[in-house]
């Protein structure tokens, strides 16, 4: 009788554990996999007629898989990326940034140039997957990829120092360089500083990029730096804060409170928080020079600002907007912004002061709060 009782108790404990695991899965991530990721591990953006895949999309999905402790999905994403974007080896090649339907009968790389934002997230995710899952292969590939990024996408800019170019081709001229402030999240820059040069100095030059190019508190999507003249912040149509720059506020908000850079960044970008609180929604576009805003940002912008907003009432307004207008199966970019922002808001992951991932694998699931 006691043996049977122990057996029933064991089964009950197992069923409880299984149910708890099911209840604590990440529903938004599971839905993203169904809507956007092929069985082979390709993240598809259905908004483009060519059904494109980007290195950015692959790298973001690798991060989400790691945060969700989804090892099978991570492996599929990694293998597809390596085989199709990196000529079979992420140790030897930076991934091409764009892949899709070239013509009715051909699916292939559409642009072989690299995109350093995807490369950065991919290297970090591989290194952290190696650490958290104790997978030596991921550590080795992540280390090799990071070295390749340093060789092919990092440049010494007179007057600035080591800077991360947006890609290996097309962003550096004789006396002019083009940068994207959203491409190197500060917490990832902090993480990479353990690898020495050039990463140990990139963290500080990246901070300069973020602080010095936002005169009114709004980060630009893109900005030029010219030798002897500095940042080109004269009013022009292209100097706006919009779909790229929304990630600057997202990354800053997700930084560990103990990182001294966080307070400086939140203070510099406070006008974005103030404007969002005033209007009830984030702006779609802001003129970086004048601070004039226009349009209503999509729901992904609201999700991206959940970690960034420091006022609880302001957070609640954006949280409700995300809940009421959750991205569907045809909104890739809004969906990834939501996985980042809402995922952080739901405590599914955090970053340590060293820039390491602190996942929520072993803790009880919580709702947004």
UniProtKB/Swiss-Prot annotation:
Lineage: Bacteria, Pseudomonadati, Pseudomonadota, Gammaproteobacteria, Enterobacterales
InterPro entries: 6-hairpin_glycosidase_sf, 6hp_glycosidase-like_sf, Glyco_hydro_8, Glyco_hydro_8_CS
Enzyme Commission identifier(s): 3.2.1.4
GO cellular component: extracellular region
Role noted for this protein: Hydrolyzes carboxymethylcellulose.
A GO biological-process term: cellulose catabolic process
Reactions it catalyzes: Endohydrolysis of (1->4)-beta-D-glucosidic linkages in cellulose, lichenin and cereal beta-D-glucans
Pathway: Glycan metabolism; bacterial cellulose biosynthesis
Record bears the keyword Hydrolase: yes
Class of enzymatic activity (EC top level): hydrolase
Stated name of the protein: Endoglucanase
Main localization of the protein described in the UniProt heading: secreted
Signal peptide: 1-22
Keywords: Carbohydrate metabolism, Cellulose degradation, Glycosidase, Hydrolase, Polysaccharide degradation, Secreted, Signal
Gene3D superfamilies: 1.50.10.10
Record GO terms (molecular function): cellulase activity
Family label: Belongs to the glycosyl hydrolase 8 (cellulase D) family.
Catalytic residues, chain numbering: 56 (proton donor), 117 (nucleophile)
Pfam families per record: Glyco_hydro_8
Cellular compartments annotated: Secreted
């Amino acid at each position: 009788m006691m043996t049977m009782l122990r057996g029933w108790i064991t089964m009950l404990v197992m069923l409880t554990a299984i149910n708890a695991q099911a209840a604590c899965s990440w529903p938004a991530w599971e839905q993203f996999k169904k809507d956007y990721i092929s069985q082979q591990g390709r993240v598809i953006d259905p908004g483009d007629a060519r059904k494109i895949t980007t290195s950015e999309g692959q790298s973001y999905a690798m991060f989400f898989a790691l945060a969700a402790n989804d090892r099978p999905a991570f492996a599929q994403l990694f293998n597809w990326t390596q085989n199709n974007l990196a000529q079979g080896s992420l140790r030897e090649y930076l991934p091409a940034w764009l892949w899709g339907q070239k013509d009715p009968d051909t699916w292939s790389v559409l642009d072989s140039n690299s995109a350093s934002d995807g490369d950065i997230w991919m290297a970090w995710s591989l290194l952290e997957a190696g650490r958290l899952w104790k997978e030596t292969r991921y550590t080795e590939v992540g280390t090799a990829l990071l070295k390749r990024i340093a060789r092919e996408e990092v440049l010494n800019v007179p007057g600035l120092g080591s800077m991360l170019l947006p890609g290996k081709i097309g962003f550096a001229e004789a006396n002019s360089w083009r940068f994207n402030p959203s491409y190197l999240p500060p917490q990832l820059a902090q993480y990479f500083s353990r690898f020495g040069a050039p990463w140990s100095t990139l963290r500080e030059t990246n901070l300069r990029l973020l602080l010095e190019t936002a005169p009114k508190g709004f980060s630009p999507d893109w900005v030029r730096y010219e030798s002897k003249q500095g940042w080109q912040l004269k009013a022009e149509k292209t100097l706006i804060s919009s779909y790229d720059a929304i990630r600057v506020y997202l990354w800053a908000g997700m930084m560990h409170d103990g990182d001294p850079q966080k307070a400086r960044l939140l203070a510099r970008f406070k006008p974005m928080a103030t404007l969002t609180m005033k209007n009830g929604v984030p702006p779609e576009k802001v003129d970086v020079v004048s601070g004039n805003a226009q349009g209503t940002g999509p729901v992904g912008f609201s999700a991206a600002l959940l970690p960034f907003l420091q006022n609880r009432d302001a957070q609640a307004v954006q949280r409700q907007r995300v809940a009421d207008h959750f991205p569907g199966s045809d909104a890739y970019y809004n969906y990834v912004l939501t996985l980042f922002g809402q995922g952080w808001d739901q405590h599914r992951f955090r970053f340590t002061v060293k820039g390491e991932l602190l996942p929520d694998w072993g803790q009880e699931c919580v709702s947004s709060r």
